């Protein structure tokens, strides 16, 4: 399945198509969006965003704790969409 992923970035909002077996960061790059990242392995917070609608599968991540995940934080480099989802990007500095 392919879902609509809406990315709310500092430079505007864009909606991209993202297959359920493709990481959000990869799909964004394929669509020509320039999102922050570093390790691409789910073990840092450079690519962090915040889910404001919908859900993602980020089981491959190893950086966020349960409280951060409950608050909606997501590592876009290891996040698969589980449906249509809205993510605010560039949220690394908001992670407490």
Curated annotation (Swiss-Prot):
Its cofactor is [2Fe-2S] cluster. One of its GO terms (biological process) is electron transport chain. NCBIfam families: fdx_plant. GO terms for cellular component: chloroplast stroma. Keywords: 2Fe-2S, Chloroplast, Electron transport, Iron, Iron-sulfur, Metal-binding, Plastid, Transport. InterPro entries: 2Fe-2S_ferredoxin-like_sf, 2Fe-2S_ferredoxin-type, 2Fe2S_fd_BS, Beta-grasp_dom_sf, Fd_pln. Ferredoxins are iron-sulfur proteins that transfer electrons in a wide variety of metabolic reactions. PANTHER family: FERREDOXIN, FERREDOXIN-2, CHLOROPLASTIC. [2Fe-2S] cluster binds at residues 39, 44, 47, 77. Residues 3-93 form the 2Fe-2S ferredoxin-type domain. This is Ferredoxin-1. One of its GO terms (molecular function) is 2 iron, 2 sulfur cluster binding. Binds 1 [2Fe-2S] cluster. The keyword Iron-sulfur applies. SUPFAM superfamilies: 2Fe-2S ferredoxin-like (SSF54292). Belongs to the 2Fe2S plant-type ferredoxin family. It is found in: Plastid, Chloroplast. PROSITE patterns: 2FE2S_FER_1 (PS00197), 2FE2S_FER_2 (PS51085).
């Amino acid at each position: 399945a392919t879902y609509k992923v809406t990315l709310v970035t500092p430079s505007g909002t864009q909606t991209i198509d993202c297959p359920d077996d493709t990481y959000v960061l990869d799909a964004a790059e394929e669509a020509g969006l320039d999102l922050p990242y570093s390790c691409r392995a789910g073990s840092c917070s450079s690519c962090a965003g915040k889910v404001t609608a919908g859900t993602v599968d980020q089981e491959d991540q190893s950086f966020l704790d349960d409280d951060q995940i409950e608050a909606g934080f997501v590592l876009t480099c290891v996040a698969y969409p589980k449906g249509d989802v809205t993510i605010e990007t560039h949220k690394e500095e908001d992670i407490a």
